[in-house]
């Protein structure tokens, strides 16, 4: 991530096609240890592409990642079935909370 951040920083500063040396210079200026192979991979994969293309490519990859929505839907179904129990538990909890202070008010 730090390599991509350095790359994007350089592009934002006006360098349309940062080189590996440019990325290394930015990271070194921030006292970040540089791994040559990661910098080279970033430069080779971004060669010939502009930042908008890279962002669009990343969005496509992220959209294919499962988000876990089915688990939330299953939880919603069980909550709908047990709605009355939830309301009773909430009322009971509120009653317990009022007894917790044992009639000792903080600002009395």
UniProtKB/Swiss-Prot annotation:
Q: Which residues carry this modification: Phosphoserine?
A: 98
Example GO molecular function:
structural constituent of ribosome
List the GO cellular component terms.
Answer: cytosolic large ribosomal subunit; ribosome
Pfam families noted in UniProt: Ribosomal_60s
- Asked whether the UniProt record includes Phosphoprotein among its keywords, one would answer yes
Annotated region described as Disordered, given as residue ranges: 62-108
Give the InterPro entries listed for this entry: P1/P2_N_sf, Ribosomal_P1/P2, Ribosomal_P2
Is Ligase one of the keywords?
Answer: no
Q: Quote the biased-composition stretches of kind Low complexity, using this chain's numbering.
A: 68-84
Q: Which GO terms describe its biological process?
A: cytoplasmic translational elongation; protein heterooligomerization; protein homooligomerization
Q: Where is the composition biased (Acidic residues)?
A: 85-102
Q: Which domain of life is it from?
A: Eukaryota
Q: What keywords are assigned to this protein? A: Phosphoprotein, Ribonucleoprotein, Ribosomal protein
Q: Which family does it belong to?
A: Belongs to the eukaryotic ribosomal protein P1/P2 family.
Protein role: Plays an important role in the elongation step of protein synthesis.
Name it: Large ribosomal subunit protein P2A
